[in-house]
Curated annotation (Swiss-Prot):
Residues 293-314 are annotated as: Disordered. The gene is fusB. It comes from the Bacteria. One of its GO terms (cellular component) is cytosol. PROSITE patterns: G_TR_1 (PS00301), G_TR_2 (PS51722). This is Elongation factor G 2.
Length: 702
């Protein structure tokens, strides 16, 4: 079967944004204008196509990334061919950043949606950082231009100041707030007005209003200069005072967008049906096809030092990345995969190179939100859901059996909050185990473990909302009723001092004894090093080599259980440099226990301290309540980082320990009579003040 759409006509894009910037509404409009939907769904009616989980429809937010395929030939059918869009709608709530992260990993370009009234918000900064990490070229779409306080050029300035990128407006607004009536296309230098009769599908072009002419010329000059900087040929033409043609302007802007030097900025109001078709045109003009992004890098499964790469080409060996696992009530497990190279036909066997297991692909479907169209093959650049995979988790590579490769994996953050869950009845016990393991398979930022001391099941995630939704899904999808305990903070422990400690385990009581003896030098690890950095400096065979791994294992086991209050110990450098052994009585177990005993002594000798997760908190409040809000943040051991004015009120930025933030949603609402809102995200671990740490250690009963 030949390729139906040439790869140059593909656009794999994500729609990403802050929680209320209007991302899902924008996606719904895209589906309407591209003819996938014949009727528009509205988020506030709970009818949006992309929000297909019940929880999403109830809460009016998007939790999982739904993937959809659509076609577009231009707002006035100006392109000679139909382009194929694979669109992923991502959540904007900070507890679900993991969904955004894994979407950006497999996309070629992104449309970042900002609210014209609220501008750059905390979550926009997070999304931007993630897009930088994966070098994703992007467009900025300033939405909600009909809202009170909307100001396109203010948002453009914020993108530059706060996100450190160079935005290049290619449109300007005509009117604002309730008088927002259209936009100026700076490339063509025409005013555009949308036709309400066909819900903004078509528009008419007119001359630019006289009062906006000077502003348009000023911003067009900025745009042309940005385009000219793409290459010497355009720059020379520009410097010699020649006019750049429309094609040259677009080519220059495209080249610089793909190189992540600039971000073209467009505007509109998705809800009022103004501007979305031009966003789609800009995706074609300025965002890359799969063949225009650098080849994806990977390593040889048998030799990590050996690097390899795959190009977006049907003739190269097959390779794909599984970026999401979802459970479907009708077909079981769906594995969403992005194909980077080669061709896969249903029924083929592939290798999961991360786990070293072969899998057979049963069926393949292309998703439109949660409706499915069955397909027979996928090719380089495609995004599809595979059915019948047995043992694939997020981030695994699927590849040709005879040409194995492991593609670069995704990093997932560790959870910062835990709660105990108990099934309400004995019958729920087994069902809960199955439900939690399925949910953990879908979501790498959600973890499940059993507390060894209390035998309780502990679930951990990225925030209170994240865990609420997990419990809700257990009830709805698996019929498990569960009680949940109070949230617990994921504290960590580390050491501040370098010290040398002797670990000795000797037991001689008839029969074969036990003898393990080692000297270990402990030190804080280098900045950014989380786990154990282990070195062996034993010389002269004072400890035989076969016992060294047991010493490392003893240290690692004790690190899991901590030395102060039972929290995991992180950031440790350990060097075993001396010791002794007994010909008969020494064993791996004896050395493991000796090393564990040495590690335990770090609580006194290593200056062990507790670390707590610190959150970046941003509160938006009317000025009248600002004093109360700031006083309250100070009481919560918050450090105020700064403040600024926005049309919505004062924005207060602070860093606050997570342990002080439980129940904050209720408190901030009652303080401000329901008018303040806040968002928070994890920034780093920091040392707990001694007075607070004493209480935590005492509570843990150590």
């Amino acid at each position: 079967m030949a390729r139906t759409t040439p790869i140059e006509l593909y656009r794999n894009i994500g729609i990403v944004a802050h929680v209320d910037a209007g991302k899902t509404t924008t996606t719904e409009r895209i589906l309407f204008y591209t003819g996938v939907n014949h009727k528009m769904g509205e988020v506030h009616d709970g009818a949006a196509t992309m929000d297909w989980m019940v929880q999403e429809q109830e809460r009016g937010i998007t939790i999982t990334s739904a993937a959809t395929t659509a076609f577009w030939q231009g707002s006035t059918k100006q392109f000679p061919h139909r382009y194929r869009f694979n669109i992923i709608d991502t959540p904007g709530h900070v507890d679900f950043t993991i969904e955004v992260e894994r979407s950006l990993r497999v996309l070629d370009g992104a449309v970042v949606v900002f609210s014209g009234a609220d501008g750059v918000e905390p979550q926009s900064e997070t999304v931007w950082r993630q897009a930088n990490k994966y070098h994703v070229p992007r467009l900025a779409y300033v939405n909600k231009m009909d809202r009170q306080g909307a100001d396109f050029l203010r948002v453009v300035a914020q993108i530059k100041q706060r996100l450190g990128h160079v935005p290049v407006p290619i449109q300007l607004a005509i009117g604002s707030e309730e008088n927002f009536s259209g936009q100026i296309d700076l490339v063509k230098m025409k005013a555009i007005y949308w036709n309400d009769a066909d819900q903004g599908t078509s528009y008419r072009e007119e001359e630019i209003p006289a009062e906006l002419r000077a502003l348009a010329e000023e911003w067009r000059a900025h745009m042309v200069e940005a385009a000219a900087e793409a290459n010497d040929e355009l720059m020379n033409k520009y410097l010699e005072g020649e006019e750049l043609s429309i094609e040259e302007i677009k080519a220059g802007l495209r080249q610089r967008t793909l190189a992540n030097q600039i971000v073209p900025a467009v505007l509109g109001s998705s809800f009022k049906n103004k501007g979305v078709p031009l966003v789609l045109d800009a995706v074609i003009d300025y965002l890359p096809a799969p063949s225009e992004i650098p080849a994806i890098r990977g390593t040889d499964p048998d030799d990590e030092e050996k690097h390899d790469e795959r190009h977006a080409d049907d003739d190269e060996p097959f390779s794909a990345l599984a970026f999401k696992i979802a459970t479907d009530p009708f077909v079981g497990t769906l594995t969403f995969a992005r194909v980077y190279s080669g061709v896969l036909t249903s029924g083929d066997a592939v290798l999961n190179s991360v786990k070293g297991k072969k899998e057979r692909v049963g069926r393949m479907v292309q998703m439109h939100a949660n409706q499915r169209d069955e397909i027979k093959e996928v090719r380089a650049g495609d995004i599809a859901a595979l059915i019948g995979m047995k043992d694939v988790t997020t981030g695994d590579t699927l590849c040709a059996i005879d040409k194995p490769i492991i593609l670069e994996r995704m990093d997932f953050p560790d959870p910062v909050i835990s709660v105990a869950v108990e099934p309400k009845t004995k019958a729920d016990q087994e069902k809960m185990g199955i439900a939690l393991s399925k949910l953990a398979q879908e979501d790498p930022s959600f973890r499940v473990k059993t507390d060894e001391e209390t035998a309780q099941t502990i679930i951990s995630g990225m925030g209170e909302l994240h865990l609420d939704i997990i419990v809700d899904r257990m009830r709805r999808e698996f019929g498990v009723e569960a009680n949940i305990g109070k949230p617990q903070v994921a504290y960590r422990e580390t050491i501040r001092n370098t010290c040398e400690i002797e670990g000795k385990f000797v037991r001689q009581s008839g029969g074969r004894g036990q003898f393990g003896h080692c000297w270990i030098r402990f030190a804080p690890a280098d900045e950014g090093q989380e786990g154990l950095e282990f070195h062996n400096e034993v010389v002269g065979g004072v400890i035989p080599r076969e016992f060294i791994p047991a010493i490392q294992k003893g240290i690692e086991d004790q690190m899991q259980n901590g030395v102060l209050a039972g929290y995991p110990l992180i950031g440790l450098k350990a060097t075993v440099y001396d010791g002794s052994y007994h010909d008969v009585d020494s064993s791996e177990m004896a050395f493991k226990i000796a090393a564990s005993m040495a590690t335990k002594q770090l609580s006194q000798k290593g200056g062990a301290v507790l670390l707590e997760p610190v959150m970046k908190v941003e509160v938006v409040t009317p000025e009248d309540y600002m004093g109360d809000v700031m006083g309250d943040l100070n009481r919560r051991r918050g450090l105020i980082q700064g403040m600024e004015d926005t049309p919505a009120g004062k924005v207060i930025r602070a860093e606050v320990p997570l342990g002080e933030m439980f129940g904050y949603a209720t408190d901030v609402r009652s303080m401000s009579q329901g008018r303040a809102s806040y968002s928070m995200e994890f920034v780093r671990y920091a040392e707990v003040p001694a007075s607070v740490a004493e209480g935590i250690v005492a509570r843990q009963g150590r």
